[in-house]
Amino acid sequence: MHRQSVVRLSRQLGAFPLVELPPPYLAPSLHFPLNRSSVQTSNFSSTAPAAGHGKDLNKSRAVSAIHRTGPRFKLGASKYPLPKPVSPEKLEKRESTPDHGLWGFFPKDRSALSTPEYDNAHGRSWSIQELREKSWEDLHSLWWVCLKEKNRIATSNLERKRLKAGYGEWEANQRLRTIRVTQLNIKHVLRERWYAWEDAQNLYKKGYRPQNEDTEESA
């Protein structure tokens, strides 16, 4: 049966009972709803098509401190006066501080890059026996001298890498190795003193007194 005739009969007779309908595989059009809903379905996006054509009243739109994004339109800088550049000849000459602490990151001649002769002019590292005779203040001062020298070598290596000088790297590494051996020996001596102090503390807790041995020897 043609679909138009089915629609005409359904309007005249109302609706077909489900009992009088043939099976769906014989007449599938009879089992579909004939009266479709007049409700309009929305698209995938519920935003109006003309929403982006109007003026954006949100001043903070697209402003993100994380992504460093600014507003969607250019802003004028006429509200704040811009500083005018000053000629270098009119600037006051500032004298550098001769004893500034940052000069410790550079060689004695205050050059940006140390020469291989300067890095190669060093002695041997401090031995453990020599460091055992030093006081705590001497070890502390020597440690900071080594640390300061390591920072100076790191500054020269960074400048050498930036300039692509191609020389002085081997001499700087040899000097750095000597400094590291000295620092390892300082740690070894301090570790020995810590263990000695810990053993003396344990003996004192057990009742050991050095003056008792002196009394027994004199008797």
UniProtKB/Swiss-Prot annotation:
One of its GO terms (biological process) is mitochondrial translation. Keywords: Mitochondrion, Ribonucleoprotein, Ribosomal protein, Transit peptide. It comes from the Eukaryota. Signal peptide: none annotated. InterPro entries: MRP-L47_sf (IPR038340), Ribosomal_uL29_mit (IPR010729). The keyword Phosphoprotein does not apply. Residues 77-97 are annotated as: Disordered. One of its GO terms (cellular component) is mitochondrial large ribosomal subunit. One of its GO terms (molecular function) is structural constituent of ribosome. Residues 87-97 have a biased composition (Basic and acidic residues). The keyword Mitochondrion applies. It is found in: Mitochondrion. Gene3D superfamilies: 6.10.330.20. PANTHER family: LARGE RIBOSOMAL SUBUNIT PROTEIN UL29M (PTHR21183:SF18), RIBOSOMAL PROTEIN L47, MITOCHONDRIAL-RELATED (PTHR21183). Belongs to the universal ribosomal protein uL29 family. Component of the mitochondrial large ribosomal subunit. Mature mitochondrial ribosomes consist of a small (37S) and a large (54S) subunit. The 37S subunit contains at least 33 different proteins and 1 molecule of RNA (15S). The 54S subunit contains at least 45 different proteins and 1 molecule of RNA (21S). This is Large ribosomal subunit protein uL29m. The lineage of its organism: Eukaryota, Fungi, Dikarya, Ascomycota, Pezizomycotina. The gene is mrpl4.
